[in-house]
Amino acid sequence: MKTSSPLETVRVELGARAYDILVGHGALSELGPRLSQMLKRPRAFVLTDETVARHHKDALEAAVKSAGIRLDWLSLPPGEKTKSFSQLEGVLDWLLAGGADRGDTLIAFGGGVIGDMGGLAASLMKRGMGFVQVPTTLLAQVDSSVGGKTAVNTPRGKNLIGAFYQPRLVIADTALLATLPARELKAGYAEIVKYGLINDAAFFDWLAVNGQKVLALEPEAARYAVARSCAAKAAIVAEDETETGVRQLLNLGHTFGHAFEAANEYRENLLHGEAVALGMALAFRYGAASGITPAADAARVTEVLGASGLPVSLEGFDPARFAADRLAALMQQDKKARAGRVPLILARGIGAAYVHPDADLASVERFLASELA
């Protein structure tokens, strides 16, 4: 990480496709100068949602005004249900109607849904147009905006249709997070904790002490947490861009979490980050029940996540939707599942995650039944 207070620059090293992540309070001011170097003509397309447009459209317009860049906007309904084939088709039609070509740039200005949709649309548009991420949620700033994963959901599961398509720039302005509800901040914080759990026990310890400062968006703490998270992900992506090896560790909590989201039919009473937090707590407890994870570490993970106001148990969820056999069947839909077995990201301790290649779904179902009892 390069430090230039109050901003930090994290480089994602991917050879000719390397790009910068600019992190900090006021980072949006860098968009105009950076964008003007990319564009062949002074206009760009902006995909956002109605909530982000209401709060931040003027800020984005102001950020590119001095560079003389005209922005064409499309605002979609907020929420996970927007990440669908029908909405994707609408985005592509908007780009085509606007005369977009491969030399143009699409800016995804929003959370993970907008970033995933925008990236997939950019990858498909005439086989690839320029793409810039300006994430406006904590979750998107530390996770989904970095690394090039794009996707839409289907009734059969989350993120099953997608592609790897890297942005050319990511602007993570922590000032944009001030309009987020506390619940959205907590959901993003779950992904920050994930990096400590994967391979950085010292960062987890720092978060256990400073997590409330991050959630309060104290500028130094927020910048440090976002930049350290982005640097952790950037290093993993540089080593394994297409998730054939170490990048799978970033799925800690996600195999459980995606099943919970699908069981809940992507309703807003369970946000993605909340599902990941619940999934991480269960992954550590499943590891403890299987003799893999020290019980004390599993208990500490549950405690730290719970102290942040994140869900750590299945208590209170609809027992019909979250029945153990139904959850196990949904986990079988995981992209990497094979013949009754599914790879799970487990941990030998905090900061020591690994790929457990063939967890038996029958044992997972028994564990879930015990959690629901």
Swiss-Prot record:
GO terms for molecular function: 3-dehydroquinate synthase activity; metal ion binding; nucleotide binding. It is an enzyme of class 4 (lyase). CDD domains: DHQS. Binds 1 divalent metal cation per subunit. Can use either Co(2+) or Zn(2+). One of its GO terms (cellular component) is cytoplasm. Its cofactor is Co(2+); Zn(2+); NAD(+). InterPro entries: Dehydroquinate_synthase, DHQ_synth_AroB, DHQ_synth_fam, DHQS/DOIS_N, DHQS_C. This is 3-dehydroquinate synthase. Catalyzes the conversion of 3-deoxy-D-arabino-heptulosonate 7-phosphate (DAHP) to dehydroquinate (DHQ). Pfam families: DHQ_synthase (PF01761), DHQS_C (PF24621). Its EC number is 4.2.3.4. GO terms for biological process: amino acid biosynthetic process; aromatic amino acid family biosynthetic process; chorismate biosynthetic process. Zn(2+) binds at E191, H254, H272. It comes from the Bacteria. The gene is aroB. The keyword Nucleotide-binding applies. Belongs to the sugar phosphate cyclases superfamily. Dehydroquinate synthase family. It catalyses: 7-phospho-2-dehydro-3-deoxy-D-arabino-heptonate = 3-dehydroquinate + phosphate. The keyword Lyase applies. It is found in: Cytoplasm. Its main location: cytoplasm. Keywords: Amino-acid biosynthesis, Aromatic amino acid biosynthesis, Cobalt, Cytoplasm, Lyase, Metal-binding, NAD, Nucleotide-binding, Zinc. NAD(+) binds at G112, V113, I114, G115, D116, T136, T137, K149, K158. Pathway: Metabolic intermediate biosynthesis; chorismate biosynthesis; chorismate from D-erythrose 4-phosphate and phosphoenolpyruvate: step 2/7.
